[in-house]
Amino acid sequence: MNKIVFLGILIFSNVVFGQDEKVINELMNQWHHAAATADEVTFFGTMPEDGIYIGTDTTELWKRDELKEWSKKYFDRESAWAFTPISRNIYFSKGQNVAWFDELLDTWMGKCRGSGVLEKQKGKWKLKHYHLAIAVPNDLVEDYLELLKKSEK
């Protein structure tokens, strides 16, 4: 009897996990699509009020409403920015109420990495923290460092 109960719990857990992974993938794809189509409501609605966005520049660290203010000129256009996900890995806490991910993106800046943390709030996943980073190939790091030195002068 205990084996049957355990097996049932195991199967149920895998189904729930698979559903959450699918929901998060869809949510993040919609979030990127919202930026590409300048859909402010969907883009910022995905983040809670205390959500954080870290961009590629060292000055780009915003709470959701600060990002909304900064990016208004971009969302006033037909497309704010267009990042296309290439791949994504999603991980879950034991309680299944926190998830984190990393993703590889195709962007106007070349390949970028995004990473983030989502929290399930009132049954819905919200993007609490997102970090965008430009991926610099290792063999170009010295050239990259030279560019940084020039920009600091």
Locate predicted features.
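Hydrophobic pocket/interface hotspot
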Residues: 31, 43-44, 51, 67, ...
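Short beta-strand edge/turn micro-motifs at domain boundaries
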Residues: 111-141
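Surface-exposed, charged secondary-structure patches
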Residues: 23-25, 68-110
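A mature extracytoplasmic/lumenal domain signature
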Residues: 47, 57, 87, 94, ...
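Short, low-complexity N-terminal intrinsically disordered segments enriched in polar/charged residues
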Residues: 8, 13-45, 65, 139-153
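Generic recognition of short, well-ordered alpha-helical segments
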Residues: 65-66, 113
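Positively charged n-region of N-terminal signal peptides that target proteins for export
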Residues: 1-4, 19
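A short gly/proline-enriched turn/hairpin at secondary-structure junctions
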Residues: 51-62, 73-80
